[in-house]
């Protein structure tokens, strides 16, 4: 067997999905094939410090990893890790991972797996850093990550691509805080209750509310504006919530379709990660033509945003008409034990370790495809 690929797994981050990231990363670290990959880990604390971690994997979900990382040696958090000087070299193609000590040599890496959800993780920011440094990385590029994270602009792209979706409006935080009554009036002119209110840039249903009347709508608008400066309002679709996984670069393929059966009124953050009351059905009990339509729309959305590597695309299937509506796309879906993305591929014939290997290979493939040759 040849040399192992050196993979850097990054977890944590400063978003509201920090805890989900830690759980996703732990799941990946437990399933990655160590016969093929040499794995290093970096955790990003909630206050944005990057820490090299080589301790037990099972200390990551609880957050204990941070204390262990800080106790490693006598270095303080200030000199333990420095992003630009000591962790990732921004000299193009340097691909360097260094520990903050004069006595330790740089550890080279081949691929980064950024298991980061939410802002500053899957919104194109960290992807831009990897592009600048010339390091292959798992997942979508800067453009697809940024657009996929912004629900409003993703909807604009889906509309242009001809993919059916719920009707919508959007407002800025300034508009909401400045005249919430006026914003409510505009929403009521267009939609009847209930409506969904969402921060434009947030994942895992963070900041999302279902408003049934004027008072709930006001509260929902102010609540969503806490999480982002843009707020999306969508008409209510009385639909079943289904999801489809996509894998690939230029020739992506779609998985089977799974259904979320929410334990709450809708599949919010609590239902996903805290109460564990929702149920998952894979494959979804849907007519074959509906499944194929969902799979086709998933690939169409993936291509419309110029995604690469992976994405999970969420849909509604109207309970009465059977019409399919795209809800949103997630360019770094969860990898927890209850996450749809790996489960959908497992049902489709790709095991978790195989899936991780394919994602790493796709990252290298895209990196090589993007290399530009210039005439001297």
Curated annotation (Swiss-Prot):
Cellular component aspect of the GO annotation: cytosol
UniProt name for this protein: D-alanine--D-alanine ligase
GO BP annotations, alphabetical order: cell wall organization; peptidoglycan biosynthetic process; regulation of cell shape
Keyword vocabulary terms for this entry: ATP-binding, Cell shape, Cell wall biogenesis/degradation, Cytoplasm, Ligase, Magnesium, Manganese, Metal-binding, Nucleotide-binding, Peptidoglycan synthesis
The organism's place on the tree of life at top rank: Bacteria
Phylogenetic lineage: Bacteria, Bacillati, Bacillota, Clostridia, Eubacteriales
Domain ATP-grasp, first and last residues per copy: 155-361
EC number(s) reported in the record: 6.3.2.4
Function of the molecule: Cell wall formation.
Pathway recorded for this protein: Cell wall biogenesis; peptidoglycan biosynthesis
InterPro entries: ATP-grasp (IPR011761), ATP_grasp_subdomain_1 (IPR013815), D-Ala_lig_Van_CS (IPR000291), D_ala_D_ala (IPR005905), Dala_Dala_lig_C (IPR011095), Dala_Dala_lig_N (IPR011127), PreATP-grasp_dom_sf (IPR016185)
Residues binding ATP, per UniProt: 188-243
Enzyme class (EC, first level): ligase
Xref: Pfam families: Dala_Dala_lig_C (PF07478), Dala_Dala_lig_N (PF01820)
Cofactor(s) for this UniProt protein: Mg(2+); Mn(2+)
Binding site for Mg(2+) 2: 328, 330
Binding site for Mg(2+) 1: 314, 328
Disulfide partners: none
Cofactor details (free text): Binds 2 magnesium or manganese ions per subunit.
Family: Belongs to the D-alanine--D-alanine ligase family.
SUPFAM superfamilies: Glutathione synthetase ATP-binding domain-like (SSF56059), PreATP-grasp domain (SSF52440)
The keyword ATP-binding is assigned to this record: yes
GO MF term list: ATP binding; D-alanine-D-alanine ligase activity; metal ion binding
Organism: Acetivibrio thermocellus (strain ATCC 27405 / DSM 1237 / JCM 9322 / NBRC 103400 / NCIMB 10682 / NRRL B-4536 / VPI 7372)
């Amino acid at each position: 067997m040849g040399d192992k690929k050196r993979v850097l797994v990054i977890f944590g981050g400063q978003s509201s999905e920090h805890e989900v990231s830690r759980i996703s990363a732990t799941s990946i670290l437990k399933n990655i094939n160590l016969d093929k990959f040499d794995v290093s880990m970096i955790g990003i604390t909630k206050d944005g410090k990057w820490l090299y971690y080589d301790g037990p994997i099972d200390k990551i979900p609880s957050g204990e990893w941070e204390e262990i990382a800080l106790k490693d040696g006598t270095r303080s958090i200030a000199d333990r890790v420095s992003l630009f000087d000591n962790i990732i070299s921004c000299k193009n193609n340097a691909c360097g991972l260094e520990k903050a000590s004069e006595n330790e040599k740089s550890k080279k890496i081949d691929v980064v797996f950024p298991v980061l959800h939410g802002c500053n993780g899957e919104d194109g920011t960290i992807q831009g850093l990897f592009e600048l440094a010339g390091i292959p990385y798992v997942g979508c590029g800067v453009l697809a990550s940024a657009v996929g994270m912004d629900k409003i602009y993703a909807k604009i792209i889906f509309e242009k691509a001809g993919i059916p979706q719920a009707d919508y409006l959007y407002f800025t935080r300034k508009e909401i805080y400045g005249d919430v009554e006026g914003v409510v009036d505009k929403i009521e002119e267009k939609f009847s209750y209930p409506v969904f209110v969402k921060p434009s840039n947030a994942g895992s249903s963070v900041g999302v509310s279902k408003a049934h009347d004027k008072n709930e709508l006001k509260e929902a608008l102010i609540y969503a504006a806490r999480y982002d400066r843009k707020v999306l309002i969508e008409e209510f679709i009385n639909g079943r919530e289904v999801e489809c996984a996509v894998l690939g670069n230029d020739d992506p393929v779609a998985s089977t379709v799974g259904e979320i059966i929410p334990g709450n009124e809708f599949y919010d953050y609590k239902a996903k990660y805290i109460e564990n009351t929702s149920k998952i059905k894979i494959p979804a009990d849907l007519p074959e033509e509906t499944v194929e339509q969902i799979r086709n729309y998933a690939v169409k959305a993936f291509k419309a945003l110029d995604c690469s590597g992976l994405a999970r695309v969420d849909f509604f299937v109207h309970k009465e008409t059977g019409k399919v509506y795209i809800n949103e796309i997630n360019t770094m879906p969860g990898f927890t034990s209850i996450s749809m993305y790996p489960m959908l591929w497992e049902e489709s014939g790709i095991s978790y370790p195989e899936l991780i290997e394919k994602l790493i290979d796709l990252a290298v493939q895209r990196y090589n495809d993007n290399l530009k040759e210039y005439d001297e």
